[in-house]
Amino acid sequence: MSKITEQIEEIIQPVLDDLNFELVEIEFTKEGKDHFLRISIDKEGGVDLNDCTLASEKISEVMNEEDPIEQMYYLDVASPGAERPIKTDKALHDAVEQPVFVSLYAPIDGSKEWLGVLQSVTDDHIVIKAQVKEKKKEVEIPRNKIAKARHAVLI
């Protein structure tokens, strides 16, 4: 996480806590000449448009007071969607028995990407049941080798 996104998280987390929303992800990017602050939120049962609108209004208020971003930017508050990132230990444990996609820093069994159902999580590793060719295979992945993880939709 960059310094600016850490600063933004400190500012908006109390607002989201008051609204009973979970902060899933913060992204501050430049696209062309425009800057975007994208914030993904969630709650038990999922968020809808009204939730995103309410959170956007409250976040705008505190961001205008604190003003941590020098340049003009567009604020986008949204649901993380079906393929939401898995960034915390809690989110990883909550994803057990669900489809996940994991990118690795280094290959395991010849692959740096694994798609399958998360079977278990420990402090040191995760186990994914993945489809390899015609059969299912359990793959043990050390947690320190995981570059990114997200929920997945299996078809």
From Swiss-Prot:
One of its GO terms (cellular component) is cytosol. It holds the Pfam family RimP_N. It is found in: Cytoplasm. The keyword Cytoplasm applies. Signal peptide: none annotated. It comes from the Bacteria. InterPro entries: Ribosome_maturation_RimP, RimP_C, RimP_C_sf, RimP_N, RimP_N_sf. One of its GO terms (biological process) is translation. Gene3D superfamilies: Ribosome maturation factor RimP, C-terminal domain, RimP-like superfamily, N-terminal. Keywords: Cytoplasm, Ribosome biogenesis. Belongs to the RimP family. HAMAP family: RimP (MF_01077). Required for maturation of 30S ribosomal subunits. This is Ribosome maturation factor RimP. The lineage of its organism: Bacteria, Bacillati, Bacillota, Bacilli, Bacillales. The gene is rimP.
